[in-house]
Amino acid sequence: MHKIINHPLIKDKLTRMRKVSTVSTVFRTNLEELTQLMVYEATKDLELNEIEIETPVVKVAKGYKLKNKICLIPILRAGIGMVDGVKSLIPTATIGHIGLYRNEQTLKPVEYFKKFPKNISESDVIILDPMLATGGSVVEAVNIIKKYNPKSIKFVCIVAAPEGLKYVQEVHPEVDVYIAALDDKLNENGYITPGLGDAGDRIFGTK
């Protein structure tokens, strides 16, 4: 399943991120705020446990808590820019990291870094990456995470190319994908068009 999250605030913030004139600090702020809006939608089907609580008015009242732990796994490095947006809503979420690079001979993603919390098998996992281009990195990230048997896996990104979305859904149809915008295509250099450029460079001001 994939869902394009259609909301006026998302459209407004994404437009600011797309602008070539947007400076790094503004880009980061809008990415964080946009991620908050995205994750609100992506987590609406999380399972709950019913609990009893005491309020200032009554001794016993019905309440709820998340059934499973939440683990955020940003794909380095651009995915790091989305973490704080989620943590502001789910401060108890744990964080893992996956680093991948593309082998220039095979064009396939190669893992260069991986660090996961110990409780990932008890967690609903949310993979974070602003861009879904060819889909290779996301597919490989899911391949790696599946070995740890999490409760579920979702992927949240900002912009996606049709080619990448199709590939992810073909290989991992059970992974729900949430996107702010489905863009036109990949250009000859592998960039999403109209896209928003190199998200990592724009987040960290390295270009």
UniProtKB/Swiss-Prot annotation:
Q: Where are the transmembrane segments?
A: none
Extract one GO BP annotation from the record. Answer: uracil salvage
Annotated residues for binding of uracil: 192, 197-199
Instruction: Select a single GO molecular function from the record's annotations and give it.
Output: GTP binding
Q: How does the cofactor bind to this protein, according to its record?
A: Binds 1 Mg(2+) ion per subunit. The magnesium is bound as Mg-PRPP.
**Which residues does the record give as 5-phospho-alpha-D-ribose 1-diphosphate binding sites?**
77, 102, 129-137, 198
Pathway it works in: Pyrimidine metabolism; UMP biosynthesis via salvage pathway; UMP from uracil: step 1/1
Q: Which SUPFAM superfamilies match?
A: PRTase-like
Cite the EC number: 2.4.2.9
What are the record keywords, sorted? Answer: Allosteric enzyme, Glycosyltransferase, GTP-binding, Magnesium, Nucleotide-binding, Transferase
Q: Which cofactor does it need?
A: Mg(2+)
| Described function | Catalyzes the conversion of uracil and 5-phospho-alpha-D-ribose 1-diphosphate (PRPP) to UMP and diphosphate.
Which family, according to UniProt?
Belongs to the UPRTase family.
PANTHER family named among the record's database cross-references: ADENINE PHOSPHORIBOSYLTRANSFERASE (PTHR32315), URACIL PHOSPHORIBOSYLTRANSFERASE, CHLOROPLASTIC (PTHR32315:SF4)
Question: Which protein, by its recorded name, is this?
Answer: Uracil phosphoribosyltransferase
* Species assigned in the record: Ureaplasma parvum serovar 3 (strain ATCC 700970)
